[in-house]
Structures are given as structure tokens and as C-alpha cells.
Amino acid sequence: MLNDLKLSLQYILPKLWLTRLAGWGASKRAGWLTKLVIDLFVKYYKVDMKEAQKPDTAAYRTFNDFFVRPLRDDVRPLNTDPNVLVMPADGVISQLGAIEDDKILQAKGHDYSLEALLAGNYQMAGLFRNGSFATTYLSPRDYHRVHMPCNGILREMIYVPGDLFSVNHLTAQNVPNLFARNERVICLFDTEFGPMAQILVGATIVGSIETVWSGTVTPPREGIIKRWTWPAGDSEGSVALLKGQEMGRFKLGSTVINLFAPGQVKLVDSLQSLSVTKIGQPLATAVEASTAAEPAPLPEEEIRAEHRASPLVDDTQDQG
């Protein structure tokens, strides 16, 4: 009954209005009140401020400044093996695995359409049919900048307007085509591992999605699909990003989806739904790589804190 009510509210609540309100509040300078809100947020979500370049919460003029806080250079070591693709974000794995023709796993027993995720772009979808994917959810406690899994040349960016459903265990199980319905920014790269898409997906109260080459992509929310292209390789005007380099950020929320071409990479065997991710740790390896790569083990306390903060964890079950 309670879950039915929560799900109904996802359809009834004015999500766009709530998102605009949250974005407005998060951008305001409110002095002691801003610091109080940040302090309460840090305490509730157990945010590790020792990792931040500015660990003192008084250093942040707005909540948005705090939310996109940069980390110290030494806290996310980058796996430099050229055969290894690294995790693009801190968070937890929602799902990962094989793309079965046009089907991507959303939750156990629930798939969504690759082509729909890519806004009906059948040519782009053709690059990734029968490839592989990884979906990473960023909880409120996480660092909210998104980085490159490997070196890449940006070729295309598509802004897709859409719904702003929350991303959690309940919606993943019950909202069909959740990630193909929500607002998103699709970024297509040429890489040494073939084409790669990195998709930034919005949700309720995600105030904005930004990229390092275009700045703020949304808002404004104009309700139309927008597309930009860039030249290949060393051409004038091309955009090249290095493995581990920041490529975008969220101001509140949400989810990153990576798509890889068939026969190019192998996802790390130990990764599964609810695995905790840290930027720079192994996500996948080149198929011809002779050695396997594994993420560094994390303290149990960190894993528990991440799971407590993640709405992907089914809170109707005992998580231990």
C-alpha cells in the first residue's frame, strides 16, 4: 500500500516545479543558513569532507558549490593501465552487463530499449547493439562530477527532454523505460575501444546537468531535442578528453550510463548490482588484455554508508 502511494506520487507531483525550486534554493547565498543546511546534510549522509579540497563547510557560499565540491588530487588514484577503462563516477552500480540486441536491463525482470534511450537514433543504437553497458547511480553523499573511463574524442552531444522521475529501487521496478523517459544528455565519443556513449540522466530535483565543453546544458528546459556535433581527431575545433579527466557534473542527482560497442571491452567480473564505485578504479578491460583488473577493496564502513544513502537498495529488506 505504501509503495503504491509512493509510486502514484511520482506521477502526480509537479516534478518540474520541484526541480526548479530545488535548483533555485541550492544556488542562493544564505550565509549561516547555507552552512547549517550543508552541515546537516554532511551529518545525515555521512559525507567524508576530508576528501574535499575544502573540508570546511563554511568555505561554500551556496549548496550547489558544496554539491559539486572538487576532491583532493590524491583521493581517487587512477588506474593507468592502457587496457583498463575506469569507473566514471562515485556511487553504486545499478545494473551492468550485456546489451541483448535492443534490450538493456533496468532492474531484475525489467528491460528498456537502447534505441529509446538514444532518443530514437537508430544509427547510434546500431553502434551498441549486443555490446555492453554499466549504469552507475550517484547518491546524495557522493562526489557529483563525472569523469572519462578512457581517452576519447567527443563526436556528438544530444540533449533529450523528458520526465524527472526519481531513480530508486521502487521506480526501477515499476516505471517502464525509466532511463529512456527521464531528461538526459547523451555524449558520444570515439575511443581506442571503439565508440563509447556516456549518458548523464536527470531526475527529480536535479537542478542542472553540465559538461566541461558546453557549460550548463539544462536548464533551460525548452522541451525539444537538441544536437551538437564535433570533428574527429586532430581537426580544428575537436574536443579531446583524457582518461580520468572530468567531463561533466550534476547539481543534485543522478545516474550515469555507459554504452560500449560489441567485442571491444569486458566488464570486470566482480562487479554486480550494488557494487560501490570509485572514480579511477577498473570498470572494464580491453577484450585482448592478458591480465584481469579488479577494483581496490573498500572498507566495510564505506560500503555500508554508500548503501544506506542509495535509494537503489530495497529498504523493505534487511540489508545487514
Curated annotation (Swiss-Prot):
It catalyses: a 1,2-diacyl-sn-glycero-3-phospho-L-serine + H(+) = a 1,2-diacyl-sn-glycero-3-phosphoethanolamine + CO2. Is synthesized initially as an inactive proenzyme. Formation of the active enzyme involves a self-maturation process in which the active site pyruvoyl group is generated from an internal serine residue via an autocatalytic post-translational modification. Two non-identical subunits are generated from the proenzyme in this reaction, and the pyruvate is formed at the N-terminus of the alpha chain, which is derived from the carboxyl end of the proenzyme. Its cofactor is pyruvate. Pathway: Phospholipid metabolism; phosphatidylethanolamine biosynthesis; phosphatidylethanolamine from CDP-diacylglycerol: step 2/2. It comes from the Bacteria. Its EC number is 4.1.1.65. Keywords: Cell membrane, Decarboxylase, Lipid biosynthesis, Lipid metabolism, Lyase, Membrane, Phospholipid biosynthesis, Phospholipid metabolism, Pyruvate, Zymogen. The active site is at D90, H147, S254. The modification Pyruvic acid (Ser) is found at S254. Catalyzes the formation of phosphatidylethanolamine (PtdEtn) from phosphatidylserine (PtdSer). This is Phosphatidylserine decarboxylase proenzyme.
